[in-house]
A protein has these predicted regions:
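Glycine-rich loops and low-complexity Gly/Arg-rich segments
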Residues: 26-30, 93-96, 103-106
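Aromatic/basic-lined ligand-recognition segments
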Residues: 76, 80-85, 90-92, 110
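Compact, glycine/acidic-enriched structural inserts
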Residues: 11-52
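Aromatic- and glycine-enriched pocket-lining scaffold segments that form the walls
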Residues: 40-41, 45-81
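A short, polar/proline- and glycine-enriched secondary-structure boundary/capping micro-motif
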Residues: 12-19, 88-93, 99-100
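Single conserved hydrophobic/aromatic residue that forms the stacking wall/gate
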Residues: 1-10
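Structured loops at beta-to-helix junctions and adjacent beta-edge loops in soluble globular domains
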Residues: 7-8, 71-73, 82, 158
Length: 191
C-alpha cells in the first residue's frame, strides 16, 4: 500500500523545462502518475529516474510550488525540485511540512535529540532536589508554534514516539491523532 502527501513550498521549487526523449510530468500530475505505475518505493525510485518534472501551469493557475512525500511499508522518501533537478531524499522521520528545504528540516531535528517520551532523569545538580510535576516533561523544549519548522519537529517527535493499536481502525485513529498534533486553527496564523 502506497501513500503520498504534498506541501506547498514558498517560491523555491525550480521545475525543469520540457525535454525531448524523457517522460515529462507536470507537478500536479506527479502523484497519480507515480501511484498508477508503482507498488512500492523501489519501483518509485526507478520510475523517477526516467522522469522530468516540469512546471506546467494548471489552467489559468501558475505552477504550484510543491514538494512531496511518498511512503510504503519499507519507509518514505521526499521529493524536491531544485535548480539542480529533482532531489530524492530518504525520509526516516516519515513526515513533511512546507519549509525550510527538507535537508535543513532533518538537520534541525538535531536540536531536539535530548527529547524523550519518558520522564527526564535529573542531571542538573545533585545539590538541588527536583520533582517531576507533570507527565510529558521529557518533551520539554518541543516547539509549539505554528511555523513549518516547528510543526516538522513536533510531528516527527509525535510520529516516531506514538504507538498504534493492533487493528487497522486503531491505526487510522492514531494517524489522525498524529495529524492533530500540528493542527492550525483558523485565525491563529495569518499570511
Amino acid at each position: 500500500r502506497m501513500s503520498r502527501g504534498l506541501g506547498d513550498v514558498y517560491k523555491r521549487q525550480v521545475y525543469q523545462k520540457v525535454e525531448e526523449g524523457r517522460e515529462n510530468v507536470a507537478q500536479y500530475e506527479l502523484i497519480p502518475w507515480v501511484l498508477g505505475q508503482c507498488a512500492n518505493l523501489q519501483e518509485v525510485r526507478k520510475l523517477l529516474a526516467k522522469m522530468n518534472l516540469v512546471g506546467t501551469p494548471f489552467g489559468d493557475f501558475p505552477a504550484a510550488q510543491l514538494h512531496w512525500i511518498i511512503a510504503d511499508a519499507s519507509g518514505a522518501i521526499t521529493l524536491e525540485c531544485t535548480k539542480d533537478g529533482l532531489q530524492v531524499y530518504d525520509n526516516p522521520a516519515g513526515v513533511l511540512t512546507n519549509n525550510p528545504p527538507f535537508p535543513m528540516q532533518m538537520f534541525q531535528l538535531n536540536n531536539y535529540a535530548g527529547l524523550s517520551p519518558k520522564q527526564p532523569e535529573h542531571r542538573f545538580s545533585g545539590q538541588i532536589p527536583f520533582t517531576s510535576y507533570s507527565r510529558g516533561m521529557g518533551a520539554m523544549g518541543l516547539p509549539g508554534d505554528l511555523s513549518s519548522e516547528s510543526r516538522f519537529a513536533r510531528v516527527a517527535f509525535v510520529k516516531c514516539n506514538s504507538v498504534s493499536g493492533d487493528s487497522e481502525k486503531e491505526s487510522v485513529s492514531q494517524f489522525f491523532h498524529i495529524l492533530g498534533s500540528v493542527d492550525q486553527q483558523r485565525g491563529c496564523c495569518e499570511g
